[in-house]
Amino acid sequence: MGRIVMKFGGTSVADLERIRAVSALVAKEVDAGHEVAVVVSAMSGETNRLVSLVDALDADCPPGEDKCGGDIHDEYDSIVASGEQVTSGLLAIAMRRRGIRARSWLGWQIPLRTDMAHSKARIAEIESSAIGPSLADGNVAVVAGFQGISDDGRISTLGRGGSDTSAVALAIALKADRCDIYTDVDGIYTTDPRIVPEARRLNRIAFEEMLELASLGAKVLQVRSVELAMNYNLPIRVLTSMAVEGQDNPGTLVCHEDQTMEERVVSGVAYSRDEAQITLLRLSDKPGMVAKVCKAMSDANVIVDMIVQGISRSDNAANLTFTVGERDLDIALAALEAAQEEIGFKAIKHDRDVTKVSVVGIGMRSHTGVAQTMFEALAERGINIEVIATSEIKISVLIDSEYTELAVRALHNAFDLHETKAPPVTAP
Amino acid sequence: MGRIVMKFGGTSVADLERIRAVSALVAKEVDAGHEVAVVVSAMSGETNRLVSLVDALDADCPPGEDKCGGDIHDEYDSIVASGEQVTSGLLAIAMRRRGIRARSWLGWQIPLRTDMAHSKARIAEIESSAIGPSLADGNVAVVAGFQGISDDGRISTLGRGGSDTSAVALAIALKADRCDIYTDVDGIYTTDPRIVPEARRLNRIAFEEMLELASLGAKVLQVRSVELAMNYNLPIRVLTSMAVEGQDNPGTLVCHEDQTMEERVVSGVAYSRDEAQITLLRLSDKPGMVAKVCKAMSDANVIVDMIVQGISRSDNAANLTFTVGERDLDIALAALEAAQEEIGFKAIKHDRDVTKVSVVGIGMRSHTGVAQTMFEALAERGINIEVIATSEIKISVLIDSEYTELAVRALHNAFDLHETKAPPVTAP
């Protein structure tokens, strides 16, 4: 008996049948004597439908007058958050019709307070003084994920995948014993099984590895949810909501490194196509120039990822290459053009057709030779590397998008990820 | 220059094209120097879509266990209110893209406070301390209609058509000069033009008449919106949102009787198929018996309409016949069965296939002979009258539903409603 948070993504609540199936999974935990808070996403496809409505109107500017009436992220949030509002109410009804007391909670009702960065807000605080007693009183709390309330009393949203972060933050605020993330896959894999059919489900993975994988494009968990869980040492279990009754569904436990137990150098290969490469040509060679670029990007709310400074062979001037999320490219380019004088560069080049491929593993800390294996595997297939970035536990390369599948397969093979290196460990 | 409230129903915001058209109508008023609050309904079809999701889950009770987990109106409200949330955000974006400052306001953000009768809540108070200054500051307020917040901090809704009431109440709270209700018809007609093609648009109609027509099934305005407007003497203009550019769109002005100016005895013929007839057989003949029936209905939140007490020819016992809204019939029957001993009756009969047909007119106050004309017209067509109810300005009869069109045409003709009795009056 304890307090648990369960989170169900869009495909898990895609229609009434799925919502009923979710209510059965929740009922099982309630019957086991747990206090349960459930975090739900919008029904699959609903967020896209709403976003497409917003985008169509957003584009209604007279020619040449970009964003004529200003930012619309506040209204985007109010519109898109309605998707989770619907699902939370529906699941609350489904729970009641099983005879289980339940009520929905919207972000502003909890309240889950965020900063003012509409459409990519960050959680500032979750009030537990209303929802906590309601749980203790035997009510299932069905929480609309992805949403909160900003200081001006408007609805805010946490960005795509934000429901994971809602769930983890709620679990921390409610001092829950664990957070189970139900999704449409049965755990975290060594790589995308659509590209490498031999990819293997991991029984456990360290927070740090999951963080890198999530940052690198493995879309199972939102990056910030993993950061949060790591900071508070909250174990997350990733498992499928589609398990057949009676069938084992251990999922993957994302937990502290000491608990992972499996010995391996590389845990997984990730890739992200949502990348764009920007190169600033012939930069003025003054101190603080990179800081100015980063400030311009940060002011525009654009996250800069891989950064490389180099010397152009043709004119011996300094160039700066970095990557941003592909959907931020236009904003980034506009911000850089506006700051061209301030930063001091001659021209901008950009490329949307790039993919970041990465190998990740806690074991890289104490093993050498990973980079060499990686670069050799890519070179053997004639794949050219544009940019390299490394951290303690990962190596990322930026390559031409058309080599994506080839690169992922080559690396999965080079690090023998299809083979189990340790006996499977059962999740608790 | 003044302050106006404009309200757009579901068909007026049915898709992005219509929302853009609405933004043009709003822009016109802004350009004329007005402060404008716009109240919007959900996109046409959206409320039905959401209600059907709710209904499907609501029906998930084990056989024999009706409403096993209790009332779900609170969750219904939270789910269905999302429709207006989306439209308000979309129209705010459309306004901004015309270069006009605008923001959406949800019921809880204003706040528009209601009682706790979820799914048919009544407005208790509209706070104008936030929205008023925002308007005065030059922002268009795009208000999600139909919704408010109840004392427990949950979303409440005002019942079908509630956006009209939102608009009128907001106009009163904001001390607006007028309230324009844009809809898919170009005004109030003498009767339903689908049944009587010769039906005529009225230039003006008295609050009292509109109130009867609205109560009687003319679906252009919600009853409570008319009551409110009458109590505060706020003129409502009903006009179409589909007018062709440059074409006259006077609509119908709903206003104080003295301002109607058109002389006529009967203004319109209304009908409502959303009726069900209940008869309690062999009632115990004790004082307060009807009061007990009314209390049972009121406790179940069911509105009782026409009431007739009679003596059964067969056994000389007292019977009580009354009508309720068809969608309340099951609730009403359940409540009556539960109170059978308390009220004291032998059996219940009910009939769903009944229609209420009514003639309405301020002039009936000072003219006799209306009832005679009405009953003769129906008798000539062999239409049997089940129940009769009258007020100062209307006569209603309950008939078998299959005679609905025949009865409406007969009455429209009997009162010469296709002829203009006074020269048309132009709305201000």
Locate the predicted segments by residue.
Chain A
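Nucleotide/pyrophosphate-binding catalytic subdomain
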Residues: 1-226, 399-400, 415, 419, ...
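Structural motif
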Residues: 2-4, 34-38, 77-78, 101-103, ...
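Active-site-proximal loop/turn and secondary-structure-junction residues that shape catalytic pockets
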Residues: 10, 44-45, 147-148, 242, ...
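Conserved dinucleotide-binding and phosphotransfer motif residues
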Residues: 32, 98, 232, 300, ...
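Terminal amphipathic helices with adjacent charged low-complexity linkers/tails
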Residues: 40-51, 238-259, 322
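Acidic/polar loop patches that form or flank catalytic/metal-binding clefts of enzymes
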Residues: 222, 233-240
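A conserved regulatory-domain signal marking ACT and ACT-like small-molecule sensing domains
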Residues: 246-428
